[in-house]
Amino acid sequence: MQKNKKVYPRYIKRLLDIVLSIIAIILLSPIYIVVSILVLIFMGWPILFKQPRPGKNEKIFNMYKFRTMTNKKNKDGVLLSDEERINKFGKFLRTTSLDELPELFCILTGKMSIVGPRPLVVSYLPYYNDREKHRHDVKPGLTGLAQINGRNTLQWEERFEYDIEYVNNVSFKMDLKIIIYTIKKVFKREDIVLSGTGKIENFNIYRKKQLEKNNK
């Protein structure tokens, strides 16, 4: 049984990632074109947002999304806060998860998988405990177990527990379940809290507060 469990993540999962990402990119190509034009109109250039993220074994890669913020600056030429730069169209892209469509190309190139722990920002790396670091034992995903169990309405510890549960139990059955539930949640727009609006505390700040509290 243990041998069968290893066959899927080592060989079959990558094959499915390639096949499904190619199919999705082809089928969604009209949406890519329309969203690209609208981003250019409402956000300006560039169309894509690029940011380094930790992948499997904490290896850094560039993750791409459609831009959801403008380049608005104050009178001194400094960018306004994230909350002030997210317009209605940007919020629409985030709540519908359309901003994440370019990640399919990261899946195709092998940097990500369709299912896995979500890739978080590089600045969080020093703040994971030994258990939480295991979320990087597999490739990050477009969606994951945490995304179908509360998404970013969860506390950080809860999210990481779901990530670790996935890492320890990855299987075709689990991936299929996560994909099906993700599609349902996207259409229902459930469990969505916009990052960059002050409603979600960054993990590094959250963990710093915990450490300071424990050291008192």
Stretches found by the model and what they are:
Residues 49-85, 143-161:
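Short, glycine-rich, amphipathic interfacial segments at transmembrane boundaries or analogous
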Residues 1-12, 157-173:
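Compositionally biased, charge-rich terminal segments
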Residues 82-139, 179-182:
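A short, structured surface patch at a secondary-structure boundary
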Residues 2-71, 178-216:
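A hydrophobic, helix-centered structural microdomain
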Residues 35, 49-50, 78, 115-117, ...:
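Short, hydrophobic secondary-structure boundary micro-motifs
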Residues 148-153, 162, 168-170, 179-184:
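Soluble extracytoplasmic domains of inner/organellar membrane proteins
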